[in-house]
Amino acid sequence: MKVIFLKDVKGKGKKGEVKNVPDGYANNFLLKQGLAAEATNSSMKTLEAQKRKEEKDAAAELENAKELKETLEKLTVELKAKSGEGGRLFGSITSKQIVDAMQKSHKIKLDKRKFEMDDAIRALGYTNVTVKLHPQVTATVKVHVSEQ
């Protein structure tokens, strides 16, 4: 019997795949558990439409990420912090503080986990911070830390 997997089934198939499985296994396990649906013409058309929609959504997401990259590359995020001698900060600037500053000054909301910082910023001046917007799109944001 031909079935369309609705969920991943270990050793049999992944979600969205169409496979031939034994009738008994399909009727007694896959269909009853809601792990698969019978592959009829209408369900195949639905699956194709769903795949096209997912591709379209992924393309739109990539386009949005590219537009956001263009915006971020032009920005400079201004932060103020207390510092000691030699431009060393008392404390550090974290990705959370950068996100908050971007939200306040530029009305851009990002997740702090998207910032790829090896370590927090601990010195005055300009620092380039990498932001992973999408698996294929990364942007660089300039962060300017000045003395308070």
Swiss-Prot record:
Gene Ontology CC terms, in alphabetical order: ribonucleoprotein complex; ribosome
Record keyword rRNA-binding present: yes
Molecular-function annotations in GO: rRNA binding; structural constituent of ribosome
Pfam families per record: Ribosomal_L9_C (PF03948), Ribosomal_L9_N (PF01281)
GO BP of this protein: translation
Keywords from the named record: Ribonucleoprotein, Ribosomal protein, RNA-binding, rRNA-binding
UniProt name for this protein: Large ribosomal subunit protein bL9
PROSITE patterns assigned to the protein according to its UniProt record, in alphabetical order: RIBOSOMAL_L9 (PS00651)
